């Protein structure tokens, strides 16, 4: 399994993520890629690769994806660098549950460190174990190789990162592949720390506007237009 994360001017959070991962003995069977995404400050100690400029989440994901496809790893675990989890079995549980459920895309359930829970309700912890869903919000997706081999490269229009998860959901739905969220495995996401700590050269409102505009323009002019709206409705109205 290839584990990957991006760092942009938040070295302490990135190194903390890696230190949490190292608690799990399964970490020693994985390969770690920590891509510095154009930081202007001190690098994370765990950095393995460095990009000269910030290519945002979507661009960084494509950099990792290109590398992943050059390896023989079965899974890519792409983690936001501002995640908190406890205990020594996060990786082991993720891998075992993905295999058990034959999930081509798997995610832990997510607790946001804010007043508001994640907008997409399928990501909440419903206390129901393993749940089949239509797509997962890309906070910490574990993705099987056969999905990424079909995608090959995420659309450049999605450089800001919004829509990578919908695009993946369109591919898995098209192929009738399993997508799973686990209530047995839950992470806490600190949320948008580059903006909250003023570590990025774009305002949060401008970023959200551009990301949303690019995402909607892409899907409204693609073969996945109808599926995109189905996935959005699934996430907004999900219930058990």
Predicted regions and their residues:
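A recurrent flexible, glycine/aromatic-enriched loop bordering the glycosyltransferase active site
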Residues: 125-143, 161
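Conserved donor-nucleotide/metal-binding helix-loop-beta segment in metal-dependent transferases, i.e.
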Residues: 89-105
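Active-site donor/metal-binding and catalytic loop motifs
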Residues: 111, 181-202
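Short, well-formed alpha-helical segments that are part of the catalytic scaffolds
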Residues: 10-25
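Donor nucleotide-sugar recognition loop
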Residues: 138, 152-170, 174-181, 185-188
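Glycine-rich, basic loop-to-helix element that forms the pyrophosphate-binding segment
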Residues: 52-68
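Short beta-strand-to-loop element that shapes/binds the nucleotide-sugar donor at the catalytic cleft/hinge
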Residues: 106-120
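Short beta-strand-to-loop acidic/aromatic patch adjacent to the donor-nucleotide binding site
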Residues: 73-84
């Amino acid at each position: 399994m290839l584990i990957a994360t991006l760092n942009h001017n938040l070295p302490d959070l990135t190194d903390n993520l890696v230190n949490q991962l190292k608690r799990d003995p399964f970490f020693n069977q994985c390969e770690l890629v920590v891509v510095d995404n154009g930081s202007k400050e001190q690098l994370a100690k765990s950095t393995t690769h460095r990009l000269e400029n910030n290519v945002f989440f979507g661009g960084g994901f494509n950099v990792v994806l290109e590398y992943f496809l050059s390896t023989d790893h079965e899974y890519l675990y792409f983690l936001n660098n501002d995640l908190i989890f406890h205990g020594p079995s996060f990786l082991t549980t993720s891998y075992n549950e993905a295999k058990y459920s034959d999930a081509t895309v798997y995610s832990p359930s997510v607790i946001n460190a804010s007043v508001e829970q994640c907008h997409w309700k399928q990501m909440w912890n419903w206390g129901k174990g393993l749940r089949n869903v239509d797509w997962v919000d890309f906070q910490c997706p574990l993705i099987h190789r056969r999905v990424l081999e079909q995608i090959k490269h995420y659309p450049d229009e999605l450089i800001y990162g919004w829509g990578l998860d919908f695009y993946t959901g369109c591919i898995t739905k098209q192929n009738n592949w399993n997508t799973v969220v686990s209530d047995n495995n839950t992470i806490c996401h600190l949320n948008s720390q580059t903006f909250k700590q003023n570590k990025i050269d774009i305002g949060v409102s401008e970023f959200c506007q551009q990301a949303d505009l690019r995402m909607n323009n892409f899907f409204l002019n693609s073969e996945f237009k109808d599926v995109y709206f189905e996935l959005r409705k699934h996430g907004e109205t999900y219930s058990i």
